[in-house]
Amino acid sequence: MKNIAVLGSTGSIGTQTLDVVRGHRELFHISVLAANSSDELLEQQIREFEPELAVLSDEAAYARLKSRYTGKTQLAGGRQAFIDAAAYPAVDTVVTSMMGFAGLEPTMKALDAKKNIALANKETLVVAGEIVMRRAKEQGVSILPVDSEHCAFFQCLQGEKRETIEKLLLTCSGGPFRGKKREALIGATKAQVLAHPTWNMGQKITVDSASLVNKGLEVIEAKWLYGVDYDQIQVVVHPQSIIHSMVQFCDGSIIAQLGCPDMKLPIQYALTYPTRQSSDFERLDFWKLKDLTFEKPDTDTFKGLRFAYEAGKMGGSMPCIFNAANEVAVGAFLKGAIHFLDIYDIIEQTMMKRACILEPTLEELFEEDAWARAYAASLLEK
């Protein structure tokens, strides 16, 4: 029986993680549930899964829940309580399914407590990949990717040596605007941006998918997870989202991982590894597959991917700057404060304004994140 902590349990990945647990109650026990502010949904989850601890980062939401709930689960509130939940003693594996830079502190806390990580919070590796991977190695714990693409790489590389990797072929649906040029995106609405053709996800990651920033974040994540150079990571647009990613080896062979687009599959793989367990997930029917097509990404129109490669190759603190500027810009877009294409301008201007720290400490990364957010926010006022 694995004891699981789900950080971000009320979000898209968190709720799908609980779906996986429902299908294998003989394998998993939910010890900790933690969310930001969705107190009503968290209360439902508490009553169903009966964890030892439940946390709400938002103090007002915590107060609301505390006034209603009278069960056995211990409740805690506030940002520090959320971070501390990652190190809960009884937990074996921590699912980090919260969004953005806010995932870094809880992930580091979990690593310091020698917890295995099922990583859905890609920003942790984007911002502090070298530090995080080194800490995991020092602590002797595993970081198992929950992203469908990185889970695909992980499976393709089973039994293979890292030095035999020639290229990681990172697939990308292309998002709702695939094939469109910049002129067609000038008046893109929030509804259009959030209409992803394949995946049902939270709003922030859906915007990132439309801008291809999400694919850029995954490029940087792949660099740290698999120890390859950026020139070895190639993004391939694959609209059907059936091939989740591929690895090309030094002899020219390519191994691909295929499956129906369902996030529960990589979630279950991460939770059950090193074994595979049965599931009732949809099966791929090759007789019904009409075609599998591939395209080169348009990085002139979708500049977020190009900026990610540039930030990654600069290294140091620049991916942190890139990520922070994007988080501010996406937040502003979702509030209707800027246009979709303004996201790229804010990222570019913020990256150009700041010198790169080549070997930043964790403390310096927090400072750089704060600076980038403040500067990006100042651009919104112009």
What are the roles of these predicted feature ranges?
Residues 1-382:
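Catalytic, metal-anchored helix/loop core of enzyme active sites in primary metabolism
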